[in-house]
Amino acid sequence: MSPWLKWHGPAMARLWGLCLLVLGFWRASLACPTSCKCSSARIWCTEPSPGIVAFPRLEPNSVDPENITEILIANQKRLEIINEDDVEAYVGLRNLTIVDSGLKFVAYKAFLKNSNLRHINFTRNKLTSLSRRHFRHLDLSDLILTGNPFTCSCDIMWLKTLQETKSSPDTQDLYCLNESSKNMPLANLQIPNCGLPSARLAAPNLTVEEGKSVTLSCSVGGDPLPTLYWDVGNLVSKHMNETSHTQGSLRITNISSDDSGKQISCVAENLVGEDQDSVNLTVHFAPTITFLESPTSDHHWCIPFTVRGNPKPALQWFYNGAILNESKYICTKIHVTNHTEYHGCLQLDNPTHMNNGDYTLMAKNEYGKDERQISAHFMGRPGVDYETNPNYPEVLYEDWTTPTDIGDTTNKSNEIPSTDVADQSNREHLSVYAVVVIASVVGFCLLVMLLLLKLARHSKFGMKGPASVISNDDDSASPLHHISNGSNTPSSSEGGPDAVIIGMTKIPVIENPQYFGITNSQLKPDTFVQHIKRHNIVLKRELGEGAFGKVFLAECYNLCPEQDKILVAVKTLKDASDNARKDFHREAELLTNLQHEHIVKFYGVCVEGDPLIMVFEYMKHGDLNKFLRAHGPDAVLMAEGNPPTELTQSQMLHIAQQIAAGMVYLASQHFVHRDLATRNCLVGENLLVKIGDFGMSRDVYSTDYYRVGGHTMLPIRWMPPESIMYRKFTTESDVWSLGVVLWEIFTYGKQPWYQLSNNEVIECITQGRVLQRPRTCPQEVYELMLGCWQREPHTRKNIKSIHTLLQNLAKASPVYLDILG
């Protein structure tokens, strides 16, 4: 064997790999302090021998200390001190536990840089005193101090005060050693001249004009004598303070309008605790228009603006230099108010070319005014020849409300020669005869068509030719439309509340090999696909269109024994290829086996001729995303009449637990949805919610998807890191999506990460960022969301436990179902 093969063959490659692995473990162990063990996020030192004498520090170029979230120290009798710089490197630290050790002293600034600390446990140490200054800047959930030999003094009186005023430390039996070296319950501690301080400001309210100066005075008192300091937050204006033992003053000069609404506090602090008195600063200033842009189209046309001013400015619009009189079709809407800043828009309902022009906004209050102008173009003037033909009659485009040229038009008609008038008269006679003949023919044709329609009321489905509207029964949700080949049908995004009906397809569901490997003999008798006669299906109107084909609202006869006909949603197959037909039949078998009260019901198929048809139950109120938006705080912007009632928290919990129930069922059947979102859930009567996906959502909600390559559309805003990076879809990835669905529900249908582009969303999710808690979301539900969004799939909450928790929360709040009317 050659020397090269001897040292570079496959066996040696495995040996080198093993050596590198051992070297990696050895290097990691060297980086961790003696008597401690380390991981990427945790340090624990529990071996008493040889033990540690100082707070553990990581070696340079080892694990990043910023990633450490928990430090556990136990049985370290020689650890006595935490110095100022011992903990500062662990800025991500959340849990610090030092128990059964020799800790005697903690430096005042030991935790100054550990703002993420939430849990501290110093049980059974040697602490005789502990100052509140260690913890005053922290938002602690737990501070456990039992088993320490505290000395009865004013230094620990703050612990007694803390127990009396708050629930933390919870149910702790704290003791201190009195002058006789006997244990005394901290609750009974009485120390003379040891009480809380007081602080008082001279003025409870402060109003000043921009650019002026003001001086605040504060007096403090208490025993022990407190320290006085000013908490000015992020005050922009220049300021300076002077303090003595019991008096202090704060002078603010050249006050900025940016400081209006900010709070200024005078704080008195001593060993026992602190007291503060606050004043709100109100700054009056002239208005400025900081933002005015060209109109954008959403539910209405909107010219967006932002105005600053205090007192609130009066707004006036001008159109082409003249005062714009607002009405219900053109009006100012203020959407967001932030003390002195107003975000809104000039809303225009269906503007035309008549509304094109210059729009000027003027904002005015007692301190001044500001104005800005924008040019708006909503649509071109009618008539395709206008732009290309300079001789096109200008009179066609005169403003209908300006009759100044009527006389000119009459004068021009008088200039026509008499011979032209005679020719025109002859042409008019011929036109009259032609109109009479055409009207007679049309009337006869209409009569024949009415007779044919009456005879064909229950005739064949008619999908090969134009699909007609058969009936107006049971369909008060929106007007019916005639649907024909080549005509423009109403899109699903423009329809009524039932505009989008979506059901499970092969696209978002990973094929279950256990299911597709079975034979017909293995299927249960009640799960065979039901075949529906084509003449029993009568179309009413088109609901939408996806990549697969169209979805129609229809009436289906003889489907249920107890009803002559029921409303259904039918999905047609556009692609008639052999592969598409095979997929169609496989999907039908799959859907037949998915039977649950919170999964959209699949009735069967129609395979008599083309196109192939799937029949699903009809959910009256359409997709959940539109339903949430229509019953949220912004519904007034979309409603044409009285806005619907806003969803309550209990109703949102009721919706959430139904979706979770459906996902528990899918997981039990070993199916992965891959596209769980509110747009793919449907709402029926009495707030009944079911999971589905007809695939139309990729067209209606195109901004929710991220195109990869030529055809693949991924819902990245609902996907976990492993699905984005490795296309790995599991039940755990569905759990992540369920967490996002909960976020959608409690934001009334907002798009996740709506303020970010798709690329920014991918970066955020892969870097570990999560969505913030919605304003209306209970803390328990947000913690549930966080449990769904754990980076490691195996650490995410179990789908059954999610459903159980949501079910319990929903039961605790009764649901009133009259919201749907």
Curated annotation (Swiss-Prot):
Residues 1-31 form the signal peptide. Phosphorylated. Undergoes ligand-mediated autophosphorylation that is required for interaction with SHC1 and PLCG1 and other downstream effectors. Some isoforms are not phosphorylated. Residues 454-465 are annotated as: Interaction with MAPK8IP3/JIP3. Induction: Expression oscillates in a circadian manner in the liver. Keywords: ATP-binding, Cell membrane, Cell projection, Cytoplasm, Developmental protein, Differentiation, Disulfide bond, Endosome, Glycoprotein, Immunoglobulin domain, Kinase, Leucine-rich repeat, Membrane, Neurogenesis, Nucleotide-binding, Phosphoprotein, Receptor, Repeat, Signal, Synapse, Transferase, Transmembrane, Transmembrane helix, Tyrosine-protein kinase, Ubl conjugation. LRR repeats lie at residues 92-113, 116-137. Residues 454-821 are cytoplasmic. ATP binds at L543, G544, E545, G546, A547, F548, G549, K550, V551, K571. The formation of active receptors dimers able to fully transduce the ligand-mediated signal, may be negatively regulated by the formation of inactive heterodimers with the non-catalytic isoforms. The neuronal activity and the influx of calcium positively regulate the kinase activity and the internalization of the receptor which are both important for active signaling. Regulated by NGFR that may control the internalization of the receptor. NGFR may also stimulate the activation by BDNF compared to NTF3 and NTF4. It is a single-pass type I membrane protein. Disulfide bonds join C32-C38, C36-C45, C152-C176, C154-C194, C218-C266, C302-C345. Belongs to the protein kinase superfamily. Tyr protein kinase family. Insulin receptor subfamily. This is BDNF/NT-3 growth factors receptor.
